[in-house]
Regions:
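Domain-level signal for soluble alpha/beta catalytic cores
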Residues: 1-200
């Protein structure tokens, strides 16, 4: 009987608490006090630090902590054609607190384009060495599907997709394209995060 071996025996999700310097920089950017370039400089510095910490702890996988994101899942969806978002002050309750989320909805058919997350991955990949591999995390296709059929989005989604089957088909094709983009950029550890199970 053949033996199957995995790259390592433990793993972690890869989303880390944001350091204060990062939170301060994002707030300053939102308030117009610093430029996008200045924000990116801080983000890159903090990612470099968190990668160094993961290596120091002996992990064989490294992530960027999802430090570039505003939301763990929605930012990824914004990287496709046909998806728009705006901050309307709405949100969902999480641990008895209101988490303010950008409304994310369709304005056309879903199609892949050059996804910004692939560029984010390339920054992370430079830190790979003989002991570590860069991992990137994205929301699962089911998460994307769920976002587009929540009650607030259902009517808008139906303007572009008459059936769930058509919606699922386009999500699948778009994901295949973006996953190929990650592969071509050298990504060999792509994690799909799926929180839709809690809605079953």
């Amino acid at each position: 009987m053949s033996k199957v071996t995995t790259p390592f025996r433990y793993d972690f999700v890869g989303s880390f608490l944001r350091p204060q310097a990062l939170k301060d920089a994002k707030a300053a950017y939102q308030d117009g006090k610093i430029s996008k370039d200045e924000l990116d400089k801080v983000v890159n510095e903090e990612i470099t630090k968190v990668v160094a910490k993961q290596k120091e702890l002996g992990f064989h996988v490294i992530t960027d902590g999802e430090f570039r994101r505003t939301f763990w899942h929605l930012d990824f969806m914004w990287g496709f054609e046909g998806v728009a978002h705006e901050n309307t002050g709405n949100g969902v309750k999480f641990n008895a607190e209101l988490a303010v989320l950008d409304d994310t909805y369709l304005v056309g058919k879903i199609k892949a384009k050059a996804h910004p997350f692939v560029e984010y991955f390339k920054f992370l990949k430079q830190f790979e060495d003989e002991n570590t591999v860069a991992k990137y995390t994205i929301p699962a296709p089911a998460q994307f599907f769920q976002q587009m059929i929540v009650p607030a989005n259902y009517e808008t989604t139906r303007k572009f997709y008459a059936t769930n089957e058509e919606l699922i088909q386009d999500i699948g094709v778009a994901y295949q394209d973006v996953i190929k983009q990650f592969y071509d950029a050298g990504c060999r550890n792509l994690q799909l995060d799926d929180c839709t199970w809690g809605a079953i």
